[in-house]
């Protein structure tokens, strides 16, 4: 028998787990709009207070994928998503968005799932719009973009229409809930590989094991000790790596890759315009901390995508495509594609 919302709430109050199959039933009820706003809010709060388990997160992610508008891709070789949970409060420029162009130029196919701002002054969607890209592409247009440019950006509201059901509740609550954790797990192109930044150290191991349960091939889940949801220059970075079906947790430092440490305040921006300017400086290969952190994260993406044999090798490849202009050319090609695709209807 499916679990009722009342039973689920009682479980959270008692700090007991909602088992995987029960979570699947519960999330289907929520996504179909069968659970009241008051009850949704109570359950989300209860889950947050007791702390979501691997089974609960995996069950909820399974349903979100089920309700999404998929991007059909035939060749997933070297495909990777570069994504963060947001919520780290760092207000940096769009590091993962910039790394997307570098990784694509380096030989990965980047199927990036993103939205508007959460923790930065400019989310991935905001940044791409500031660069001239059209973000609200339909699934078949995203698939074509991925095939032609090596990049497919999936704007979350287009691909997760069922999320409209819980949007008012989330907005009114104004706090992190399980949905902040679910976004990076629900890539509509079903990318088998992922570089994921998280906002809390506990999530490094949890999200890596959720991805393991969801059938991901390879993953790097990262949290910088300075609070960044990226591989950081300002401190060590905790890493949960999924490879060959096993999860290994370890720590890396910028010095491990011959990169100088630099505080995250050197990467801060005030708005989308400043973020755009810094992103373009990186793609034009202007030396500095911004270039270094993008090379580091793009290198990690190339490693997890299977293009590079190690993060260090990936960084070398990233610096090559930044230096020879390939990364900037990748941005220009992607923006042109989105504009043309929209003009053609």
From Swiss-Prot:
Gene Ontology CC: cytosol
Q: Which GO terms describe its molecular function?
A: anthranilate phosphoribosyltransferase activity; magnesium ion binding
- Reaction catalysed by this enzyme: N-(5-phospho-beta-D-ribosyl)anthranilate + diphosphate = 5-phospho-alpha-D-ribose 1-diphosphate + anthranilate
Q: In which residues is Mg(2+) 2 bound?
A: 229-230
Keyword Translocase belongs to the record: no
Q: Which Pfam families does this one have?
A: Glycos_trans_3N (PF02885), Glycos_transf_3 (PF00591)
Name the positions where anthranilate 2 binds.
170
Q: State the pathway, as annotated in the record.
A: Amino-acid biosynthesis; L-tryptophan biosynthesis; L-tryptophan from chorismate: step 2/5
**Record's InterPro entries?**
Anthranilate_Pribosyl_Tfrase (IPR005940), Glycosyl_Trfase_fam3 (IPR000312), Glycosyl_Trfase_fam3_N_dom (IPR017459), Glycosyl_Trfase_fam3_N_dom_sf (IPR036320), Nuc_phospho_transferase (IPR035902)
Main EC class of this protein?
transferase
Query: Where is anthranilate 1 annotated to bind?
Result: 84, 115
How is the subunit organization of this protein annotated in UniProt? Homodimer.
State the family named in the UniProt similarity comment for this chain: Belongs to the anthranilate phosphoribosyltransferase family.
What this chain does, per the record? Answer: Catalyzes the transfer of the phosphoribosyl group of 5-phosphorylribose-1-pyrophosphate (PRPP) to anthranilate to yield N-(5'-phosphoribosyl)-anthranilate (PRA).
Name of the protein: Anthranilate phosphoribosyltransferase
Q: Which organism is it from?
A: Xanthomonas campestris pv. campestris (strain B100)
Where is the organism placed in the taxonomic lineage, from the top?
A: Bacteria, Pseudomonadati, Pseudomonadota, Gammaproteobacteria, Lysobacterales
